Curated annotation (Swiss-Prot):
Signal peptide residue numbers: none
Family designation: Belongs to the class-I aminoacyl-tRNA synthetase family.
Protein's recorded name: Arginine--tRNA ligase
Short motif ('HIGH' region): ranges: 130-140
PANTHER family in the record: ARGININE--TRNA LIGASE, CYTOPLASMIC (PTHR11956:SF5), ARGINYL-TRNA SYNTHETASE (PTHR11956)
Entry EC number(s): 6.1.1.19
């Protein structure tokens, strides 16, 4: 019996209890809250439904709780129920009912934890979207990990998800990139507002290799050659780095295409028709303050060139016309102002502002020997994705970046995350999986097969704690998806790994010496295999490997 199953049982029981007494059943919440008590002595689960409903139906909370207890104790799945405090109900689940969690996990396999909770959404998930002017920095790397995990999570909860990278290849930063390449090719210092680092020199050399005559060309042809080849080489490197990091995209959209295809002009024309564009001081303004923004925004500057938001308007409209009902943007810490701005764009175009969600990620700091790591040899200035992977590996990098809420800054201790230690969270979780795989191999060598026939034998408190933890997986995934917080999955896996290690230390799974394998061994092996499956499913959501040996 999972928490969701118990919540359904509590609601149906409460409905019957109220109905039998002529009380209003509509006072019940759509979903009854079920929680695991902090103190295991208080039971397996607790609910506050009596406290929620009693006042609405005109009875004392403890009276309603008492009626619920009377009805629940007769149910086969309930081993015990009692009133606590002002009207809480503490519950103990029967071992055989609890054991169905194990059987269900083994039956569902890789799909365990999946649901259709997000099935109504067709989601465009845009993340990373780094400028093609240098390698992906550590902030973008955080989004590469979190965005990919969120996409996997939402897909497991039934959403149709398209992972998209918006390629910012339009604007002044590209001009600075091109001037930096040309300066490097000529053996000069980078422009004061340009880019430096080994990667600039490498790309400049490759441009000359492909077009030996490039430096002899006159402008604007020379800049166009460096732009075309240089941007392509940089973007190729970015995509390769992301792929090696385990993050792939379904769609790459070029910002420049919004302008060259006429999409920007079309979007602005649509806003003019609805009266949401006006003219002032020679510029065209969006009435964004009418839709929750703190001020109106210039969309066409007085010199006739589109402002940056013009591309955002066209891009959002493009997404909607491609069939997405929800557009999630994952942006850096300096983009808080974009939340109201993008929602205003949606509303001005006639869509629900809630069709835009903006997640803001905070800073990432790297630490080695207690000191901050600030410089990258490759990039010349900032730490990059490749730097982090070189230091601690893909799995540790992804896990370290995912396991904390994105709205908090994180410090990554490179020594800790590279260590084979239980203090290293990813090692701790992966070791639990590898240990389970080793146990399964040893069981096979002994001829022991798992069985779900006698799961009622799993009555040890450590077995119960592990089973109840496994039963939370579906609810964890649903909440994590709804809140757009994949870090909840990582923290859950650490809890499950802890539950498993404590179970293993207290409950012998394999027969010893001449001991004949029995039903309890087979049931415990089934519990171990179910635990292995849940850990593997969770690591898959995070894009982290589940090693069979360590």
């Amino acid at each position: 019996m999972t928490p969701a199953d118990l919540a359904d049982l509590l609601r149906s029981t409460a409905t019957t209890v109220l109905d039998e007494r002529g009380l209003d059943t509509s006072a019940l919440p759509a979903v009854v809250t079920v929680e695991r008590p902090r103190n295991p002595e208080h039971g397996d689960y607790a609910t506050n439904v009596a406290l929620q409903v009693a006042k609405k139906v005109g009875v004392a909370p403890r009276d309603l709780a008492g009626w619920l207890v009377e009805a629940l104790v007769s149910h086969a799945a309930i081993a015990g129920a009692e009133i606590a405090g002002p009207g809480f109900v503490n519950l103990r689940i029967a071992a055989d009912a609890q054991g169905t969690i194990v059987a269900n996990i083994l039956k569902a396999g890789e799909t365990y934890g999946n649901s259709d909770a997000q099935g109504t959404h067709t989601i465009n998930l845009e993340f990373v979207s780094a400028n093609p002017t240098g390698p992906i920095h550590i902030g973008g790397t955080r989004w590469a990990a979190v965005g990919d995990a969120l996409g996997r999570l939402l897909a497991r909860q039934g959403a149709k998800v398209t992972r998209e990278y918006y390629f910012n290849d339009h604007g002044a930063q590209i001009d600075r990139f091109v001037r930096s390449l040309i300066a490097s090719a000529e053996g000069k210092e980078a422009p004061e507002d340009g880019y430096a680092g080994d990667y600039i020199a490498d790309i400049a050399k490759q441009v000359i290799t492909q077009r030996p005559e490039a430096l002899t060309l006159t402008e604007p042809e020379r800049s166009e050659v460096f732009r075309e080849i240089g941007v392509d080489l940089m973007f190729t490197h970015i995509k390769e780095s992301l792929h090696e990091f385990g993050t792939d995209f379904d769609v790459f959209t070029h910002e420049d295409s919004m302008h060259t295809s006429g999409r920007v002009q079309e979007a602005i024309a649509q806003l003019r028709k609805t009266g949401n564009i006006y003219e002032k001081d020679g510029a065209s303004w969006l009435r964004s303050s009418n839709f929750g923004d703190d001020k109106d925004r210039v969309v066409i500057k007085s010199d006739g060139n589109p402002a940056y938001i013009a591309g955002d308007i066209a891009y959002y409209l493009d997404k909607r016309e491609r069939g997405f009902d929800l557009c999630i943007y994952m942006l850096g810490a300096d983009h808080h102002g974009y939340i109201a701005r993008l929602k205003a764009v949606a509303a001005a175009l006639g869509y629900d502002a809630d069709s835009v969600e903006v997640l803001i990620g905070q800073m990432v700091n790297l630490v080695r020997d207690g000191q901050p790591v600030r410089m990258s040899k490759r990039a010349g200035t900032v730490i990059t994705l490749d730097d982090l992977v070189d230091a601690i590996g893909v799995d540790a990098a992804r896990y370290a970046l995912i396991r904390s809420s994105v709205d908090t800054s994180i410090d990554i201790d490179l020594e800790l995350w590279a260590s084979a230690s239980s203090e290293n969270p990813v090692y701790y979780v992966q070791y639990a999986h590898a240990r389970l795989c080793a146990l399964a191999r040893n069981a096979a060598d002994l001829g022991l097969q798992h069985s779900t026939e006698h799961l009622e034998l799993l009555t040890h408190e450590k077995e119960g704690a592990l089973i109840r933890g496994l039963g939370e997986f579906g609810r964890i995934l649903q909440n994590a998806a709804a809140l757009r917080e994949p870090h909840r999955v990582a923290r859950y896996l650490e809890d499950i790994a802890g539950d498993y290690h404590r179970f293993y230390d207290s409950c012998r799974v394999l027969p010893q010496g001449d001991e004949t394998p029995g039903d309890l061994h087979a049931a415990r092996l089934a519990l171990c295999l179910a635990t292995r499956q849940v850990i593997a499913n969770g690591l898959d959501i995070l894009g982290v490997s589940a090693p069979e040996r360590m």
